[in-house]
Structure formats: structure tokens, C-alpha cells
Amino acid sequence: MEKIKVILEALDAVNLFDIVVYDMKEKSPFFDYFLIASSTSDRQLQASISHISKDLLEAGFEHPRVEGKNSNSWILIDCKDIIVNVFTKDEREFYNLEKMLAEIESIDIEQLK
């Protein structure tokens, strides 16, 4: 299974919402996809780390690096060619990464599943 599908299924398993995927292949030499998702709580935020890590390992991919592991509002999961940002709703609104990425078209996640 493709790595992006594994990650999207893991995010879905912990009921994250407002998931946006940006195709960065033409924009960044460092990663192919940039994901943003929202959580309702810090517990859900932390659950996303373990679900993504476990599911990637089970699918034969490397263990991701995690920044903000002890944060209760924003974590970044570095899966090498895919970057996943999980925010609480308020933190996502505060940082507003979508505004910074406004020129980049987002991908319909149903096409990736």
C-alpha cells in the first residue's frame, strides 16, 4: 500500500478532521506531500502519533520522526517524503498554514484512498 494511503487511514482511524493534502512534488525538493489535520483534543493529537507510526511500520515503511511529541496543540510527523501536521482547532487557526500554502492546490483525499 502506498505510504500516503497508510497515513490517511491512520488519521481517519483516530477521527482527525479537516484533512488537507498538498502535492509538493513541484514545489519542494524535500518532500512530496504536506498534510494538515485537526484534532479535538491533545489526547487525540497524541493518538495520531502512535497510529501513524504503528501503521507505517506494519506496512513496511520506516518509523517517522516526530516534532512536538510533548505538545498538546501541534505535532509534526516527518515521514521523509510526507510531512503531517496535526493541530488542535485553535492552534490551526492561529498558525493558518493554509494561507501560506494558498497558491498550492490541495488534493481531494478521496482520490488518494
Predicted feature residues:
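Polybasic/polar functional segments that serve as interface/processing modules
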Residues: M1-P29, D42-I75, K89-R92, L97-K113
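Short amphipathic alpha-helical segments
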Residues: F31-Y33
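Active-site beta-strand termini and strand-to-loop segments that position acidic
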Residues: I77-C79
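Short hydrophobic/aromatic beta-strand micro-patches
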Residues: I36-S39
